[in-house]
């Protein structure tokens, strides 16, 4: 699919994915990534795949290689951006809306980087203004991307402003750029959860990364939720009697 889009005139094929929709604690992270057409800018990456199929060591190695390559975008054609949204926002708007917002923001930041040759660009500019294709893992597009796609379809625009946004089910196993975004999102979030484990060691965030394991749920029941637990997720919701609009404070 990526090769076909390049042949159709897209300058960049952006892959988008998220990490952290299901956990009981921690942020949701979305990432957007672009890779070179021929892969020559990624000599040290042996494997890019759906991050869930990779070991932690493989993900870290891939992330380090992506990060190193992105420092010389003009030579490598590698760039990425990510957005981290806190659990308080997840509780405020719900996890789906938070995920969509994070994806929109990651794409926005990356599009600004691409305008600036990988170093940043015009703040607030629309992702639809670049000749690019945005491929999102899953079955729906974030609102801003959907609006840009609809606007593109309604207007008879020139080739230079070509824009396409598409949701791709299981895209992290089909599209290399989505796989790269998957790695960036997962590694970024895992690192944040390991840091959280140092602040709240009794929950074991460094091992389960906030997911609802038996040990994690037992710790929540024993100690109560901490600052980064999602009050809108069960069993925390029932434990604290949370309802949307009542953002509880730490005791």
What is each model feature region?
Residues 1-251:
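RNase H-like, Mg2+-dependent phosphodiesterase core
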């Amino acid at each position: 699919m990526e090769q076909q889009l390049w042949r159709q005139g897209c300058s960049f094929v952006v892959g988008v994915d998220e990490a952290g929709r299901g956990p009981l604690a921690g942020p949701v992270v979305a990432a957007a990534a672009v890779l070179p057409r021929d892969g020559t800018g990624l000599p040290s990456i042996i494997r890019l795949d759906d991050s869930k199929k990779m070991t932690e060591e493989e993900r870290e190695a891939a992330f380090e290689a992506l990060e190193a390559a992105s420092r010389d975008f003009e030579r490598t054609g590698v760039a990425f951006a990510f957005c981290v949204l806190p659990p308080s926002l997840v509780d405020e708007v719900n996890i789906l809306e938070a995920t969509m917002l994070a994806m929109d923001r990651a794409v926005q930041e990356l599009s600004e980087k691409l305008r600036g040759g990988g170093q940043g660009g015009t703040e607030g500019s629309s992702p639809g203004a670049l000749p690019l294709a945005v491929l999102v893992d899953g079955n729906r597009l974030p609102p801003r991307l959907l609006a840009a796609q609809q606007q593109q379809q309604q207007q008879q625009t020139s080739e230079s402003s070509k824009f396409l946004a598409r949701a791709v089910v299981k895209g992290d196993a089909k599209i290399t750029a989505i796989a790269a975004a998957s790695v960036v999102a997962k590694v970024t979030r895992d690192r944040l959860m390991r840091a959280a484990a140092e602040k709240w060691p009794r929950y074991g965030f460094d091992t389960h990364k906030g997911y609802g394991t038996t040990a994690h749920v037992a710790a929540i029941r024993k100690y109560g939720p901490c600052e980064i637990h999602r009050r809108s997720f069960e069993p925390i919701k029932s434990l604290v009697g949370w309802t949307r609009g009542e953002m509880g404070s730490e005791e």
